[in-house]
Amino acid sequence: MAVIYYDKDCDLSLIEKKIIGIVGYGAQGHAHAQNLRDSGLKVIVACVEGGRGWKKATADGFEVMCVAEMAKKADIIMMLAPDTSQAKIYKDSVEQGLTPGKMLMFAHGFNIHYGQIVPPSFVDVTMIAPKCPGYMLRQVFTEGAGAPSLIAVEQDASGKAKEIALAYAKGIGSNRAGVLETTFAEETETDLFGEQAVLCGGTTSLVKAGFETLVEAGYQPEVAYFECLHELKLIVDLMYQGGIAYMRDSISDTAKYGDFTRGPRVINEETYETMGEILGEIQDGSFAKEWILENQAGRPVYNSLRRMESEHLIEEVGAELRSMMSWLKKKK
């Protein structure tokens, strides 16, 4: 079972005199910066000068500067820019500011695990990865609670990398919920697999396959949309709240019997084999290489697939039906 750290394991005093630099002020960046500041810590923010993040961080009262200047000043540098831009930011602006005793920190292990960023041996390299969106990390903190995080240590030059990272986790409030120990490899590989096989790739492909099956059989696209996409949230919310068993206790016996007997025919042995292949491509680095080259080439495949998917009938039908849902309009 995993090792989980709580408040008694986290000593905020270890970083009270340190300067924490946050690279990026987007979904995660704003939450980290504000939570750390509210915990009494010194925080500076680095963004593209004049950009949206720069303006927002300035309006929120932070000292904002370019990444190179921040890298020289900060003792702990948290990389919260998009994964695809981190390697360039590091090479152009962060690397030259690193000196012995500093810590380079990440919220996702991709660039370290796949060698896109190779820090010098004299700095600590750690990860604190909150398991929730940035807005939720901030919200639960202000309510006096916290969101769970993962912690990993890739490089311990100081001999206190884990302790310092745990102090950071306390600064963002994760000590209140629990900080689960992992590795850069495990976090990266499981995160990518979850996205590709289940959360994003698996779910969207399953939804579209169900929708297309009903439409091709002559059913109205609008009804197919309701049954295969719209109602998905109802089921996922139940699973999120209490797990699979809780969800099954909340649905009809007819639905439950169909789940038990038909579900394994949809996700069958062939599906397991394909999932194994997808995991293998993540583990051996071939997916990472493919994605890195795709970005270097200007994303031709990505852009083509994105355009093609946006033209699927399910998008047209969904837009029409969602326009009928007043509660969705209120959220925009």
UniProtKB/Swiss-Prot annotation:
KARI C-terminal knotted domain span: 183-328
Record keywords: Amino-acid biosynthesis, Branched-chain amino acid biosynthesis, Magnesium, Metal-binding, NADP, Oxidoreductase
GO cellular component: cytosol
Top class in the EC scheme: oxidoreductase
EC number: 1.1.1.86
Pathway assigned to this chain's UniProt record: Amino-acid biosynthesis; L-isoleucine biosynthesis; L-isoleucine from 2-oxobutanoate: step 2/4; Amino-acid biosynthesis; L-valine biosynthesis; L-valine from pyruvate: step 2/4
Cofactor(s) needed for function: Mg(2+)
InterPro entries given in the database record: 6-PGluconate_DH-like_C_sf, KARI, KARI_C, KARI_N, KARI_prok, NAD(P)-bd_dom_sf
Catalytic reaction list: (2R)-2,3-dihydroxy-3-methylbutanoate + NADP(+) = (2S)-2-acetolactate + NADPH + H(+); (2R,3R)-2,3-dihydroxy-3-methylpentanoate + NADP(+) = (S)-2-ethyl-2-hydroxy-3-oxobutanoate + NADPH + H(+)
Gene Ontology biological process terms from the UniProt entry: isoleucine biosynthetic process; L-valine biosynthetic process
Binding site for Mg(2+) 2: 191, 227, 231
Cofactor note: Binds 2 magnesium ions per subunit.
UniProt record similarity statement: Belongs to the ketol-acid reductoisomerase family.
UniProt protein name: Ketol-acid reductoisomerase (NADP(+))
UniProt source species: Dehalococcoides mccartyi (strain ATCC BAA-2266 / KCTC 15142 / 195) (Dehalococcoides ethenogenes (strain 195))
Lineage: Bacteria, Bacillati, Chloroflexota, Dehalococcoidia, Dehalococcoidales
